């Protein structure tokens, strides 16, 4: 009896990890590269001023530092509804009008993976 239960638990581990994060980090990375990288950079640290065209000096948060301090719900709200939804800058646009809830959760999962890979 113990062995079949153990096998079943091992088979369910990947789906439990996905459910815990609420999204797929691999898909989230693709979306991030397409929609977020211009402002937040390829690793979430903000603009690489040496490689960008001249832009106004708009502060962009270092996501590797900010994400661990925020809940998934908070991050979903910022991405879906924009910075003003949580009393941040109006310069963070809302993406909820053209991203599914699954896409939003995938991006949050990717942001969480950035935090883990930075350690």
PLM regions and their residue ranges:
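Periplasmic/extracellular electron-transfer cofactor-ligation site
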Residues: 22-23, 29-59, 80-90, 114-119
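Bacterial N-terminal signal peptides
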Residues: 4-15
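Extracytoplasmic electron-transfer domains, predominantly the class I c-type cytochrome c fold
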Residues: 54-113
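Boundary at the C-terminal end of the N-terminal hydrophobic targeting segment
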Residues: 17-21
């Amino acid at each position: 009896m113990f062995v079949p239960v153990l096998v079943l638990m091992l088979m369910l581990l990947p789906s439990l990890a996905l459910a815990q994060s609420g999204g797929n980090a691999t898909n989230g990375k693709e979306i991030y590269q397409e929609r977020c990288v211009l402002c937040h950079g390829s690793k979430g640290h903000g603009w690489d001023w040496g490689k960008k065209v001249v832009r106004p000096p708009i502060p962009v948060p270092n996501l590797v530092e900010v994400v661990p301090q925020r809940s998934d719900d908070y991050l979903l709200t910022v991405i879906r509804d924009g910075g003003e939804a949580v009393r941040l800058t109006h310069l963070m646009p809302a993406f909820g009008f053209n991203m599914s809830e699954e896409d939003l959760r995938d991006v949050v999962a990717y942001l969480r993976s950035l935090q883990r890979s930075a350690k």
